[in-house]
């Protein structure tokens, strides 16, 4: 009987821990929420301020250089998303390197040769506005500044949904 209660006790805490982990991973920004106030400094690409994003469709893509799924997503951004929208004045792409400095991102991009801007977030200040853990993450905000789409992880199907959401936002 003692073993039963010990197992039951352990099972309860494993379940509770799993629920808490899922809650900790939940998006801080929900569909329909306003875009958090983002400021990014970059010598290479210029600074981003909340004022510079007003009235634009804004995609915030959060990644790390060591993350495999992030690499897949960024390769798709380079291949299909960036060529389609880079010249659209109503669209802004913010690819933000979680825990990376501008120097680290510059070195990383020398290898990857991405043509889109990479913004540093060494202290997770921007990342922490959106989530506590898990990358890649994508957040798309409409011209009104409201969240219209979000995803965690990478799949081709989710990326197609993101592209559709961008297209709809720019109409």
PLM feature spans:
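N-terminal "domain-start" segment that seeds a small globular fold
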Residues: 21-50
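Short active-site neighborhood of thiol/selenol oxidoreductases, capturing the structured segment around
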Residues: 49-71
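Thiol-/selenol-based redox modules, centered on thioredoxin-like
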Residues: 140-171
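Short, internal strand/loop/helix patches
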Residues: 94, 109-143
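Short loop/turn microsegments at loop-to-beta-strand junctions
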Residues: 35-36, 58, 135-137
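Bacterial N-terminal signal peptides
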Residues: 7-16
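Positively charged n-region of N-terminal signal peptides that target proteins for export
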Residues: 1-4
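Structural microenvironment flanking redox-active thiols in thiol-disulfide oxidoreductases
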Residues: 71-112, 125-128
């Amino acid at each position: 009987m003692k073993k039963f209660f010990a197992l039951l006790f352990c099972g309860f805490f494993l379940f509770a821990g799993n629920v808490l982990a899922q809650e900790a991973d939940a998006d801080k920004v929900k569909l329909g929420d306003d875009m958090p106030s983002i400021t990014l400094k970059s010598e290479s690409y210029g600074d981003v301020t909340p004022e510079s994003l007003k009235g634009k469709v804004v995609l915030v893509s959060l990644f790390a250089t060591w993350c495999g799924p992030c690499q897949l997503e960024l390769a798709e951004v380079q291949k299909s998303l960036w060529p389609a929208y880079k010249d659209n004045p109503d669209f802004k792409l913010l690819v933000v390197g979680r825990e990376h400095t501008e120097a680290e991102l510059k070195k990383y991009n020398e290898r990857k040769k991405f043509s889109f801007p990479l913004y540093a977030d060494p202290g997770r200040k921007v990342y922490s506005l959106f989530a506590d853990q898990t990358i890649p993450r994508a957040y798309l905000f409409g011209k009104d500044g409201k969240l219209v789409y979000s995803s965690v992880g990478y799949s081709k199907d989710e990326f197609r949904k993101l592209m559709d959401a961008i297209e709809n936002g720019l109409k």
